[in-house]
UniProtKB/Swiss-Prot annotation:
Subunit structure of this chain's protein: Homodimer. Protochlorophyllide reductase is composed of three subunits; ChlL, ChlN and ChlB.
GO cellular component, one term: chloroplast
Main location: plastid
GO molecular function: 4 iron, 4 sulfur cluster binding; ATP binding; metal ion binding; oxidoreductase activity, acting on iron-sulfur proteins as donors; oxidoreductase activity, acting on the CH-CH group of donors, iron-sulfur protein as acceptor
Location in the cell: Plastid, Chloroplast
Pfam families in UniProt: Fer4_NifH
Protein name: Light-independent protochlorophyllide reductase iron-sulfur ATP-binding protein
Catalysis: reaction(s): chlorophyllide a + oxidized 2[4Fe-4S]-[ferredoxin] + 2 ADP + 2 phosphate = protochlorophyllide a + reduced 2[4Fe-4S]-[ferredoxin] + 2 ATP + 2 H2O
Species for this entry: Staurastrum punctulatum (Green alga)
GO biological process: light-independent chlorophyll biosynthetic process; photosynthesis, dark reaction
Length: 289
């Protein structure tokens, strides 16, 4: 099974991806996480350091694939999760999609691409150009990370459009949304009414999720020394269980931009009179990790 994780920049995709990878490993699956971001920090909380990228390794070998060994590019992370960082082209030059393609090509050359039960692509930001939509070419499912905010749901809608487009020629489905670190979910619910799709989980506003990224540890590793964190891990285990159930998923039909703008803005501008005095309710939730 291959999964591509997308979402608005800064929404917490890498933190969420790493914890989902661990949760899948806890369910007995062999997992490979591929970071698809020039920052090459997707797997930081799994390995504890910035691992060398595929592109760096290929450059050091003058792009002689036959000189590259699995241990040159695949690093063992916490919980037995294997980690790869694709890297990216120089800033302002090249195409990220090409880098993803080279990564998959190399892993196939190493006979590693098909050795895993689950491969998870963690893709940068909400960029859905042909290049950074490339992981969707290899994925069975897409997961969108969002929060209860206006901008994050706009990004989710654009990603949903990319999934629909790719599904025309690939057996790709949207597994669903994951709400990350949000105190409310009313806007998420409003969106999925207009664009039906599963909501796999909504993680509450837990500071330790943000702190885990700074510490370079997953929530599962933090829970080893602080068992009070186990309840947070249960959220990710629930997501893993839904993924492994191999649900049918959906081919989403995105909401037109102007219609979505009206839908989301009207929801806050026209609150019921009983709640108009509650300033907290009227504020958009823009909290991110």
């Amino acid at each position: 099974m291959k999964i591509a994780v997308y979402g608005k920049g800064g929404i917490g995709k890498s933190t969420t991806s790493c914890n989902i990878s661990i949760a899948l490993a806890r369910r007995g699956k062999r997992v490979l996480q591929i970071g698809c971001d020039p920052k090459h920090d997707s797997t930081f909380t799994l390995t504890g350091f910035l691992i060398p990228t595929i592109i760096d390794t290929l450059q050091s070998k003058d792009y002689h694939y036959e000189d590259v060994w699995p241990e040159d590019v695949i690093y063992k992370g916490y919980g037995g999760v294997d980690c790869v960082e694709a890297g990216g082209p120089p800033a302002g030059a090249g195409c990220g999609g090409y880098v993803v393609g080279e990564t998959v090509k190399l892993l196939k050359e190493l006979n590693a691409f098909y050795e895993y039960d689950v491969i998870l692509f963690d893709v940068l930001g909400d960029v859905v150009c042909g290049g950074f939509a490339a992981p969707l070419n290899y994925a069975d499912y897409c997961i969108i990370i969002t929060d209860n905010g206006f901008d994050a749901l706009f990004a989710a809608n654009r990603i949903a459009a990319s999934v629909r487009e790719k599904a025309r020629t690939h057996p790709l489905r949207l597994a669903g949304l994951v709400g990350n670190r949000t105190s409310k979910r009313d806007l998420i619910d409003k969106y999925v009414e207009a664009c039906p799709m599963p909501v796999l989980e909504v993680l509450p506003l837990i500071e330790d999720i943000r702190v885990s990224r700074v510490k370079g540890k997953t929530l599962f590793e933090m829970a080893e020394s602080d068992p009070s964190q186990n309840y947070v891990c249960d959220f990710y285990l629930n997501i893993a269980d839904q993924i492994l159930s191999k649900s049918e998923g959906v081919v989403p039909r995105e909401v037109p931009d102007r219609e979505l703008f009206s839908l989301l803005s009207d929801f806050y501008l026209n609150q019921p009179s009983s709640s108009t005095n509650n300033s907290e309710t009227n504020n958009l939730d823009f909290l991110m990790v």
